[in-house]
């Protein structure tokens, strides 16, 4: 039994999807709240958090019960275990950070997809199949179809080699990390600099040329709208930290103004 990834279906239909990044709140209930709020998916960040895989496992189970896909950003791209283990516990996909070379991309496909596309290790009767493997070949094919594999484009080498990177079969999305990209271009903190925006526009064009979904992380509605108008379709919107902090600040200010 394989979870049907409604986020991936929406993207195939040409829709825009939105989802926040979680890196602080360790609660399965967060998945239900995001589903109730209407988000299409959410990220769990292992690159910049202290989450254990056991913590992530509980959050993923809750997300599947609430029918909201989870995309895990692993802590590293450098070995199979960083990619395959989040998928084995039921993540609907991966956002693989710090991609720079074609070899990086080929490794991602090998470690995240089953044969014949990749060479992911076989352990089908796990959380990702609700502990029932079914027919082996059918299950492998279904998992390959439902998993979304996104490359995080956040280094100048990735920008320069992007057409080669996206030509590797098995990649669904090219997702820009604006902060790291700006730093890689020598202008840290200046995500609105023309050089950064030119690089991001390049990602959109090359992704579309290769039938790959372009995506980006944004911190505001205005910024999200700006990039949607330019062609972005997979939108990462804020973080759990920023969403909570914003509503708390707004509430406190409103309460104080009532005094």
Positions of PLM-derived features:
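Glycine-rich, proline-tolerant flexible connector loops at the mouths of alpha/beta enzymes
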Residues: 30-31, 35-58, 176-194
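N-terminal amphipathic alpha-helix/helix-capping segment at the start of soluble metabolic enzymes
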Residues: 1-21, 133-145, 201-202, 208-209, ...
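Conserved, mostly hydrophobic/aromatic
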Residues: 20, 34, 45, 94, ...
């Amino acid at each position: 039994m394989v979870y049907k990834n409604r986020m991936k279906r929406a993207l195939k239909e040409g829709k825009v999807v939105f989802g926040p990044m979680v890196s602080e709140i360790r609660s399965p209930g967060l998945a239900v709240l995001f589903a109730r709020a209407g988000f299409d998916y959410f990220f769990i960040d292992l690159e910049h958090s202290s989450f254990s895989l056991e913590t992530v496992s509980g959050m993923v189970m809750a997300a599947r019960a609430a029918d909201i896909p989870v995309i895990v950003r692993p802590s590293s791209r450098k070995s199979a275990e960083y990619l395959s283990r989040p998928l084995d516990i039921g993540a609907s996909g991966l956002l693989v950070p710090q991609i720079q070379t074609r070899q990086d991309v080929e490794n991602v496909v090998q470690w995240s997809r089953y044969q014949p596309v990749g060479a992911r290790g076989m352990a089908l009767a796990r959380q990702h199949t609700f502990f029932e493997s079914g027919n082996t070949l059918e299950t492998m094919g279904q998992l390959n179809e439902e998993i979304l594999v996104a490359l995080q484009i956040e280094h100048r080498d990735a920008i320069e080699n992007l057409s080669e990177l996206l030509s590797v079969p098995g990649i669904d999305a090219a997702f820009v990390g604006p902060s790291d990209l700006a730093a890689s271009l020598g202008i840290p903190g200046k995500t609105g600099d023309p050089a950064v925006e030119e690089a991001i526009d390049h990602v959109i064009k090359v992704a579309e040329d290769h039938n790959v979904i372009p995506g980006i992380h944004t911190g505001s509605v205005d910024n999200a709208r700006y990039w949607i108008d330019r062609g972005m379709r997979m939108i990462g919107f804020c973080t759990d930290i920023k969403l909570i902090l914003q509503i708390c600040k707004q509430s406190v200010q409103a309460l104080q103004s009532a005094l």
